[in-house]
Amino acid sequence: MGIMVGLPSPSGSEKDLQLNFGKNMTVQVEMRAPHLPAEWDLQSGIQLTWPHAGTDWAYMLKEVQECFVNIAREIAKRELLLIVTPEPEEVKKQIVATVNMDNVRFLRCETNDTWARDHGAITMIDTGNPSLLDFTFNGWGLKFASELDNLITGQAVKAGALKGQYIDCLDFVLEGGSIESDGMGTLLTTTECLLSPHRNGKLNQVEIEEYLKSTFHLQKVLWLDHGYLAGDDTDSHIDTLARFCSTDTIAYVKCDNTEDEHYEELHAMEEQLKTFRTLAGEPYRLLALPMADKVEEDGERLPATYANFLIMNDAILYPTYQQPDNDRKAGEVLQQAFPKHQVIGIDCRALIKQHGSLHCVTMQYPSGVIQ
């Protein structure tokens, strides 16, 4: 089955690219000026950076690899999957029985850790052509080793694992989990993370906003000043707190328990979200995700969150924590946000032991990047 491409007549300053994947599936791709896609825009595939014995997962390697296999299986049912690992042959043994190997690609590469969301390339699209922006990843503000992970994007482009124009942005520290795009020129982020002194400490908020607007061709940056999760290493990444689900919808973590340590900050975050406006000047439709019950490891509270879901072409993968009521409620909210998607829960209790979850270990790439 081939891919047939037809270009209709341009309309205004934009035109559409029609992709026909056989007789039953047609996708319209907007040929727009440079923009930062939304996560729900058409994807070619997802990156996972696989855990191995040289990572912080060594003490629970089998448990976390089982979680990665479950994520890989759901991805490869639907899209291409790029697995970054120093040991492709070993990973193949782990996944071959249950994962659609026709959709799996490997990049042999040394790695420090597994958080592809933060060391993966951030992709811009210009009239249908992808550009792969390679920012510095410095271990969330110099907290953890990152020298190998910081090289992955450059190696992936050089090896042809990622297709697109490589753009060196290594003079700026930025993690994918710290920004949310609506695909139309609005960015959602947190002051706690982007103003961290150990990231781009020489720049103030105005300068950082100007950099973001210039780099990503934005019209507006929405800064959340409130919201955090105990045990979080990222300085309040936005993908743990509030997520765009469409250009006018945001799903966010809501805490109803006044005795919970998060109550005041998450309530303040909710109130600030109510003040935000779309580019059309309208308030956002806000969908409240439940606050996960306390998850602890060795007496330490872990940053379990339902906001850390992954949007795919026809499915939503979201983390569950063996909390039946909360897991169910979160799935129902996400189904409301994405009525045409299949919503699939994946047990992420293993991931949260290293202070991350499902979205943190994945990075999606728009059409054409993974082939």
Question: What is each residue range found by the language model?
Answer:
Residues M1-P10:
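N-terminal export signals
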Residues F21-Q371:
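The feature marks the mature, well-folded catalytic cores of soluble enzymes
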Residues S11-K15, E282:
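Serine/proline-rich low-complexity intrinsically disordered segments, especially terminal tails, linkers
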